């Protein structure tokens, strides 16, 4: 980290820091003075929210961040998932971004990968609503890359 990072949390808000979950009891500002892996509560996707292929990929990438002891397993799941998604999607924008997301995770930048995945949700929703990705394929992806269910 080149400089300090300051974030503000509201009372009752949670933050995931290096695998630990913290809840603050009052409004507080945190200042990170060195490198840290964190995820704000409003960016955490619960398993039941991982209902589309990209949301499933997001869930797996977030596990790399918030579960350090399971990082190797989550990274292996991510590799399997990204490979599958690269063969299923036909949209050039999604394909290019998936390759960039893969590179981000490969270089230890899972947080940036999460942001990039969220940026693809609208395109994915459009693809799914127009049945450009057949529902049977979506279901196959769901079964293949959703072992937490």
Curated annotation (Swiss-Prot):
Q: What is the lineage of its organism?
A: Bacteria, Pseudomonadati, Pseudomonadota, Alphaproteobacteria, Hyphomicrobiales
What is the protein named?
A: Probable flagellum biosynthesis repressor protein FlbT
Q: What family classification does the UniProt entry report for this protein? A: Belongs to the FlbT family.
Keywords recorded for this protein, A-Z: Bacterial flagellum biogenesis, Repressor, RNA-binding
Superkingdom: Bacteria
Any Pfam family matching the protein: FlbT
GO terms (BP aspect): bacterial-type flagellum organization; mRNA catabolic process; negative regulation of bacterial-type flagellum assembly
Functional note: Has a post-transcriptional repressor function in flagellum biogenesis. Associates with the 5'-UTR of fljK mRNA and promotes its degradation.
InterPro entries noted in UniProt: Flagellum_FlbT
Which organism does this record belong to? Rhizobium etli (strain CIAT 652)
- Could you say which residues form the signal peptide? none
């Amino acid at each position: 980290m080149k400089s300090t990072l300051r974030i503000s949390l509201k009372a009752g808000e949670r933050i995931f820091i290096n695998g630990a979950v913290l809840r603050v009891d009052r409004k507080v500002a945190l200042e990170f003075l060195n490198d840290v892996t964190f995820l704000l509560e409003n960016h955490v996707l619960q398993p039941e929210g991982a209902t589309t292929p990209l949301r499933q990929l997001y869930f797996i990438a977030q596990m790399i961040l918030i579960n350090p002891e399971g990082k190797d397993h989550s990274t292996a799941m991510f590799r399997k998932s990204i490979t599958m998604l690269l063969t299923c999607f036909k949209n050039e924008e999604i394909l290019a971004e998936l390759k960039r997301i893969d590179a981000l995770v490969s270089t230890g930048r899972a947080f940036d990968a999460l942001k990039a995945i969220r940026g693809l949700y609208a395109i994915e929703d459009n693809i799914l609503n127009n049945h450009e990705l057949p529902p049977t394929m979506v279901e196959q992806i769901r079964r293949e890359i959703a072992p937490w269910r």
